Amino acid sequence: MDRLKVILFITSTCLTTTLYAKQQVVCVFDPIGKSGDAFALAKDYALEAKNWGADLSLKAYVDERVAAEDLKVGKCDGAIISGLRGRQFNKYTGSLDAVGALTNMKTAINAYKLLSSPMAAKNMVVGPYEIAGLGTIGPAYLFVNDRSINTLAKAAGKKIGVFKYDEAQPKLVQQVGGQAVSVDVTNAGAKFNNHEIDIVPAPSVAFKPFELYKGLGEKGAIVRFPLTQISANFIIRKDQFPAGFGQKSRTWVASQLNRTFGVIAKYESDIPSKYWMDIPKNEQLNYMKMMREARIQLTKAGIYDPKMMNFLKKVRCKENPSNFECALNDE
């Protein structure tokens, strides 16, 4: 009997080793390709992942849609994509990008770290997929081709770029009376630079590679009021990775958040000061109220996850309990 147990143990160990001996293919969305920052960070991550029993083979994608589709059909064992694109795999974490939900770095870091803790692990798995890391690309700012567009009212009638796969953005544009123009990561910069659109939301990291200064010209500006944080998701097919990999990965990614935000701050400081435009406090409040109303409507419409909206409100109100929304209970 003892001999049989030993044989079974050795056999099961060999099977486990064989199962994870193959490399896990991770598809990395980076609009620049293999020479981009996202792919460089993924290479650093791949070295760390060896400590958790994974051997990652990285594949660069310049088209995020294809990366997500390849994850669905099993060509990728994991994919690093934006939270907007990742919402189809996990609505809870995919709602992190909700408009106005996380508008400053400190609140965002706290939210991401809480979501990466073991206490939140049950929300990270949906079907065969697991969120193995929550990162950020940075705040989304409005790039406008005319700095006279400094209030919500003045955005009425303007052509505003919206990502066609995000149901929320067209509704927001409609709310301010703008004209939604469908864009994707590959052509948003070109459409702004060629004056096909007047306004485009984008992170600071897009300023140089997409040459957005061309669209800004002499009259344009970047509104220094973040609409949201653009999250990055590492989504894996759970059964293709060693047991416990997801939590180890989330913990490590969360430990790098301060470093990540430091890099983002450097990108922002590298943008010439002449392009930044501050808006008055009363107009900031108008933005916050408009975005809050939009979040509530979009949650009722089933686009945002209500549990995530409630969680993010708690995080915001812990940071700033005097905020007007903290006395309200409809979100």
Where are these predicted regions, by residue range?
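Bacterial N-terminal signal peptides that target proteins for export
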Residues: 1-7
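Bacterial N-terminal signal peptides
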Residues: 7-16
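Sec/Tat signal peptide C-region and signal peptidase I cleavage site
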Residues: 17-21
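Bilobed "Venus flytrap"/periplasmic-binding protein-like clamshell domains
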Residues: 22-52, 130-194
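Extracytoplasmic small-molecule ligand-binding "clamshell" domains
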Residues: 26-107
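Alpha-to-beta junction loops
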Residues: 71-81, 159, 179, 194-202
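Contiguous mixed-secondary-structure segments that line small-molecule binding/active-site clefts
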Residues: 72, 82-176, 212, 226-330
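A ligand-binding cleft/hinge motif common to bilobed small-molecule-binding domains
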Residues: 83-93, 189-194, 199-225
